[in-house]
């Protein structure tokens, strides 16, 4: 079998994942407004795909053609464009279908031609008092440099200003970062009707208000467009430049980076399309996509709650871990010292972690706090706690990852604010991102210093903890806390040798340990001992690890995979991966936690990790995986994994065809894993 038959291209696998998101928008069992929001998630994902994956592919094509090689990447580009076009056609059809369904529920998203006289008057007042201040036309002439002016992934209206036989052009930015994209209009008869209008259409209606008095014209026509830029940046090293200065400079590069996709309204006149392509220096490698009247559907993620309660998901109130609420504990440290605590978001509340850090910030017994941040919430209480801790005389060290994609600017801001407050801020070495999810609290207890550690699979982010599934392990077990301390020492001194007996730490020992554990399963299978591998990942694309899993399958090891996103491995290939089953689940929460389970001859090993099985995570980032040493907590993770693999509602097969076929229910009972996990955790969190 040829090499190309053993692996799915990661870009195509990623698009298949986004098509699963689109399936959720099409799923009539989902509430109507949630289906609209899935359209927004699909659109947001696709924007990121073009910024990152497509831009990387474009660079590969340019390099290979400069070297005179026959580029496989060019063939892949064609496959991508074909797949995106087909999915986008499905998107357009779904959007129209959902508009009709909303109308049946008395929710009307109307355009500027459907306004009543009363609504027209109301809109002009709204424009004058709330919107006009944010509108400044960009006139397109010979001197205009649109590459410098246009913002990445913003929607613009390209306006024809027609006077006789002369046509001039201007651009209007849709200011959806300053004004809501969805605007509720005053109701008409009957009163139960709920009309809304998009910001785009308000500008279309008010074109005269924008241009009158400044231009002579016979007609104004507006067409929507959007440009996506390459999200990569170059870190040009200079002896006198700090990493923060380099990142700030590189972010400015991103703002004017190469366009990689140009989407425009399908009926935009060809002459205007040509002007925009020329001004944006759109090359033949870029994706030029004619589309509908509206772009930036990512704003539909925040589609407002309107209409009846059954149009959105029934809420699942986040659960408290009742161990923290026992009267015998004076604080969170007492609870964790007595036994390890495992939290699983968003089923559990993130409040426990926030409260522990708040307590640490003023507890007289706390000596020091170390934490690493990758993506934090906009109004982060964790940052506030670190600042308060510094003000209270604690020794506070915050490791800020300045190279967290799309969060670089926010992290530069946090780094400056923390430094000003007296916090010791350190950064990763360039090229070695810190993706681990750790904190370490050192506390004086009697004559001893006791350490409390957090090892997680997700970010310290209050917002994503409500949307992403992730684990937090809180422990005072010295076997783990001593090694978390070593990780922080390694971060501060990345070129000093360091060893770990319990933790799996990239780039130190992850690949070696994973290979050893897979090889042990192979040996056990060959000896007739219990064997098996179960993995829950966001992405599985490292060829070395994929090949090791193929070898395990060939030796009779049963491999079960739950991969949300990219998966290069092809299950069920005869003679290669007969013993590998792979599924993916897309539902109301984003499956984000990483879990590795090895049968280990009957004594299961369960690991929680920040690392996906991608080359960058294994070899070029600082990642941490921890074994679950407490048998109770180990069983809890195993139970949750069993529920996920029993899903008969939201699980799809991962296969060679990228078909996204749903796992058939057959005669099994209906199990929607995320709802079943909520019930499972709720059953555990009952008062004594």
UniProtKB/Swiss-Prot annotation:
PROSITE patterns per record: PLD
GO cellular component: a single term: polyphosphate kinase complex
UniProt binding sites for ATP: 45, 468, 564, 592
InterPro entries hit by this protein: PLipase_D/transphosphatidylase, PP_kinase, PP_kinase_C_1, PP_kinase_middle, PP_kinase_middle_dom_sf, PPK_C_dom2, PPK_N_dom, PPK_N_dom_sf
GO terms of molecular function: ATP binding; metal ion binding; polyphosphate kinase activity
Coiled-coil features, chain-numbered ranges: none
PLD phosphodiesterase domain residues: 430-464
Cofactor needs: Mg(2+)
Domain of life of the native organism: Bacteria
Reactions catalysed: [phosphate](n) + ATP = [phosphate](n+1) + ADP
GO biological process: polyphosphate biosynthetic process
EC class of the enzyme, as a word: transferase
Annotated EC: 2.7.4.1
Binding site for Mg(2+): 375, 405
PTM info: An intermediate of this reaction is the autophosphorylated ppk in which a phosphate is covalently linked to a histidine residue through a N-P bond.
NCBIfam families assigned to the protein according to its UniProt record, in alphabetical order: poly_P_kin, PRK05443.1-1
Functional note: Catalyzes the reversible transfer of the terminal phosphate of ATP to form a long-chain polyphosphate (polyP).
Membership in a protein family: Belongs to the polyphosphate kinase 1 (PPK1) family.
PANTHER family: POLYPHOSPHATE KINASE (PTHR30218:SF0)
Name used for this protein in its record: Polyphosphate kinase
Species assigned in the record: Salmonella typhi
